Amino acid sequence: MELNRRQFLQAAGAAAATAAVAGMASTAVADEAEVMTAEKADATKWSFEIAPDPIPEDQISQVIEHDFVIVGAGMAGVCTAVAAAEEGCDVIVVTASSTAISRGGSNHAIGSKYQIEKGIDYNPEVARKIVKAEQTAGTYFMDKKKWARWINHSAESINWTIDLMEGKGLKCCLEPGFPDPDGIIDVPPASHNFYTDEQPFGALWGAPIEARTYAQILTEDLGCEIHYNTIAKQLVREDNNTGRVSAVIAQDSDGNYIKYVANKAIVLATGDFSRDRDMMRRYSPVAYEWFKDQLDFETLNYDIELAYNGLMPGDGQKMGLWIGAAWQKTYPVAPMINGGASGPAHGVISNFWGLNMDIHGERYMNEVTNFSYGAMAKLMLPEQTAYSVWDVNYAYTQDSWERFGCCIDLENGIMPSTPEEIIASWDKSAEAGESAGIAATSVYWKADTIEELVEKMTGIDKEKALETIKKYNEYAKNGLDEEFHVNPEVLYPIENGPFYATKSKGATFLTVCGGLRTNDKMQVCDENDQPIPGLYNTGIMTGDFYANSYNFVMPGQNLGAVCGTLSYLLGKDLAQL
């Protein structure tokens, strides 16, 4: 519509008058249609909740029938498939990826034969304290029955995995534990990873090797098929979405629709939903706000493994919702985040235990925690920015410095650093002006005096920082931290040059842990907590296993529990159907 000059002036005058009235009226609100209310929110559907039209039967080019159809060839999917096939089950795996995939490598286990061999006293009774600490951290919102199944069958499942992997030439090692000086989140060596001579870094790259080995066992030894590059699109639930889930329709790389009929059950193991913007906004809103500029909601790569900008689009979760599955009860879905204040870490999953400051030059917490809790604290800071300060003597606060990838007996050849080597690494980083980690980079400084160091530290209140360092040194000399009460055993003064500092911003996003409502037998349930006949899920999309955050207090819990033990048990349970 076009306006002449007179109409334009009339409209402008009316708008000005309206604005004036609105400005004077303290209760004035925007147009009612723009105001969200609880009633409107309840009546609104998210994009992912709206089911697509059913794929017509005449578009289906092939029907393939098996007793069990497992959707997804990540760690959980192939573990479930092998466990079921070993029991004689007729299994097929359908996956969007071009190979079996996974990421990381740490499998937390309780009471394995490998731990017993190494003299590590860790069994369900010993683990009671750390389990209670973890469940308390999750405010008891998680499903404790799932936890009990994991804890009580952890040794059984990891021993099974060790035997399978070693049978194919892989080696197992144990990563160091986390020695909390306060004994609150103290955990012994419990993270098992698998490595080869060609790839000794099992803590970071062991999971892909493990998943591909499961796939090899499934196809070569057990005679089952994996259909790669085949994306599941819809579940088929009988009786107008009130009966049994009997099939899944998938699309192959040529665009053909294939109907996979499951005579007994379908298992969803499709990973997380961190590449779906709406699902992140709806189910993990805090993580969404923190990382929305980092996450990639446009690109889809079903072969993705180690990445920090999102993983999967939530295919399995959506398909479940479309046929009547309920969402998990725990809210929000727990994000997996790490990357605390940077600096020399007493263990690879430690926050920097020395002096941490914010942009105001002030301390903000008891620094002695792990790198996940350290990251959470950093994300709450102004500009999400933390500074760390220490002196050269800090290198001698322990005899050796664990490197990421080390095993407790150094079997894989990755050696810890000596104090002299760690100092050399600080000098190298300071010379470069930065320290590049696995997923993030920190600004690095070095100076001969504290005053010179602080002068180099950009973005911080320098005067306040000097006061804070002075006060911290007094606490260290007196053996009493009067602010945050750091354990005096790890309270070290900053007094002998050269001096070092880092500046780190934000945190590292890995994934989100949760999805469809799932009981302890891994059955997908409806809003009334009733199992949906014929439908299971497993892996990271398992609902209600985690709460608040995945905090790495039991490092390797995700691969060890939902992708390992619970998937193993599901495979064995399927054989009883």
Q: Where do the protein language model's features map onto the residues?
A:
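A glycine-rich dinucleotide-binding beta-alpha-beta segment and adjacent secondary-structure elements
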Residues: 464-549, 553
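Conserved redox-cofactor binding core of oxidoreductases
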Residues: 149-256, 277-278, 476-496, 501
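N-terminal glycine-rich dinucleotide-binding loop that anchors FAD/FMN and/or NAD(P) in oxidoreductases
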Residues: 105-132
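Rossmann-like flavin
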Residues: 125-189, 445-452, 456, 461-465, ...
